[in-house]
Amino acid sequence: MTRPIEVRKVPIEHVSDAAGLADLIDAGVFSADDVIAVVGKTEGNGGVNDYTRIISTHAYRAVLEEKGTRSKEEVAQVPLVWSGGTDGVISPHATIFAYAPEGRYLPTDEPRVTVGYAMSEVLLPEDIGRPAMVEKVAAGVRVAMERAGITDPADVHYVQTKTPLLVQDTINDAERRGETVYTHNTLESMDVSNATTALGIAVALGEIEMPTAEQIFHDLSLYSSVASCSSGVELDQAQIVVVGNARGVGGRFRVGHSIMKDALDMDGVWAAIRDAGLDDMPVDCIHPRHIKGRLVNLFLKCEADPTGRVRGRRNIMLDDSDVAWHRQIKACVGGVVAAVSGDPMNFVSVAAVHQGPSGGGPVIAIVDLEA
């Protein structure tokens, strides 16, 4: 049986700031050795050449090494999943998942947060966008579920991943070995990597059957309702963090999910918050005061609707040559979500093909039932 989990959100006040993590460790909220995973937003451009993710990784790993007993190699295995780009009001921050100190919480038959993590097999450049990547990710998700003590996929509410994308060096490497890659457009490869990973999650959880090569990044009817996939240049495997609920674990946190049907779907956000356990709010709740400080964080994926319209109204995000649609839709959804939560420190990430319905995306909420 896994141990009870602490989930805490801390601000990032500058690009190399890890003081929030250090303060929690110093305060005895959890030990450095018990940190399982970190999911956060960094303030870079969110693109291929966003190195703020690497800076945050170094800063957080340094704290874990300094304040814990794990070796550098062991700390390197802790998933640190950073999504770059804090467009609009989105505020840089980190959500930290850690085992609670022994004896702090008693076991309970009520569902409480449990976390498992895994690293996939190495993802080769030629795997990205193809069935091999789907299979490798699916296998990793199953390992993470087992480590979380989850046997029923219905108890999984959030799967956060970080996977490699393509850069010119890895494209050249594949071609030197006689292999081909899905795309030579490195920015597009971010979307492709995320999309393929999401299908691996969906396969592992039984949401879909194994897709064909032709369906990857094309058949938008295939998606996972709990996948949140990011990609970057800093790794060559899939980092996989599975968050769900389990009975008998204990603790004070619970996770739930829903979907946003489009970029303006506040009801989808409220549905996720209620699904996580805050079901005492009015059905027509439209104000953050009803949350009463019990929401730890929201995690969302978003995508510009490929039709170029939202609720029938035309927009030009996909035609804008000055500001990439990635940044525009992220800022839009970040504002919508902040209006619901009353807090701009939400995890909002873009490139959401196969993550929720086309033009929408998954919404995951983690709540503190004792706040």
UniProtKB/Swiss-Prot annotation:
Residues covered by region (RU A): 1-104
Region (RU B): 112-247
InterPro entries per record: AtzD/Barbiturase, AtzD/Barbiturase_RUA, AtzD/Barbiturase_RUB, AtzD/Barbiturase_RUC
Site (Important for substrate specificity): 326
Chain positions recorded as Mg(2+) binding sites: 303, 352, 355-357, 360
Recorded GO MF terms: barbiturase activity; metal ion binding
Biochemical pathway: Pyrimidine metabolism; uracil degradation via oxidative pathway; malonate and urea from uracil: step 2/3
Keyword set, alphabetical order: Hydrolase, Magnesium, Metal-binding
Amino-acid positions noted as binding substrate in the UniProt annotation, renumbered to this chain: 53, 83-84, 194, 230-231, 330, 349-350
GO terms, biological process: uracil catabolic process
Taxonomy, superkingdom: Bacteria
UniProt family annotation: Belongs to the cyclic amide hydrolase (CyAH) family.
Protein function: Responsible for the hydrolysis of barbituric acid (2,4,6-trihydroxy-1,3-pyrimidine), an intermediate in the oxidative catabolism of pyrimidines. Catalyzes the hydrolytic opening of the pyrimidine ring of barbituric acid to yield ureidomalonic acid. Can also use cyanuric acid as a substrate, albeit with lower efficiency.
Subunit structure: Homotetramer.
HAMAP family listed in its UniProt record: Cyc_amidohydrol
Protein name (record): Barbiturase 2
Protein species of origin: Nocardioides sp. (strain ATCC BAA-499 / JS614)
